[in-house]
């Protein structure tokens, strides 16, 4: 959209989708862009069904548990929260009043930063769309987590050219063993099958 397209859109509607991703490892078989690719596709689908505009994706986020893997780009919690606040404030200044926040990256600190930032900007309504709450567990054979069956399946559907299933592995993780941090518990970066 050009700024003039945004001006025309705002005469009709005041809502916008703001997708978030993260640049982080997703095992040997998925790209660093997995979270953003999923968020972008979900935002596009929602836009097509509802007519809501989509803001450009925020590619970087808080990725504490995957920071040791080359290619992961991590933003500190406070820096990310302030950055999100600035973006939300800019959207408010443009006269958007309702912002739908959609993140393909679901680490708790990343989500908390987005939610806290949205509470700090007055005069906007911000809604966090948590796609992890969708009822899809009955079609999965394994518990969804990170670079797992769920994310791999979504990427195979959305961007099969970005998935290298010849590199996929089935590294077994005992979930209770890494309640504090997953940094030392997986070689491949896959948390879940």
Predicted regions and their residues:
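Extended, histidine- and acidic-residue-enriched regions that form the cofactor-binding/catalytic faces
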Residues: 1-193
């Amino acid at each position: 959209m050009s700024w003039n397209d945004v001006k025309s859109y705002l005469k009709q509607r005041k809502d916008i989708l703001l997708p978030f991703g993260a640049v982080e490892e997703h095992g040997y078989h998925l790209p660093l862009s997995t979270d953003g690719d999923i968020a972008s596709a979900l935002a596009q689908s929602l836009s097509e069904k509802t007519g809501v505009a989509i803001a450009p994706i925020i590619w970087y986020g808080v990725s504490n548990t995957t920071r040791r893997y080359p290619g992961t780009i991590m933003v500190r919690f406070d820096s990310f929260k302030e950055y999100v606040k600035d973006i939300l404030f800019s959207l408010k200044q443009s006269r958007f009043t309702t912002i739908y926040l959609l993140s393909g990256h679901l680490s708790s600190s990343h989500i908390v930063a987005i939610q806290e930032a949205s509470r700090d900007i007055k005069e906007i309504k911000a809604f966090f769309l948590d796609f992890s709450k969708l009822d899809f567990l009955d079609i999965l054979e394994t518990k969804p987590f990170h670079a797992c069956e769920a994310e791999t399946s979504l990427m195979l559907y959305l961007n099969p050219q970005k998935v290298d299933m010849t590199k996929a592995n089935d590294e077994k993780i005992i979930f209770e063993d890494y309640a504090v941090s997953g940094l030392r518990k997986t070689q491949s970066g896959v948390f879940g099958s």
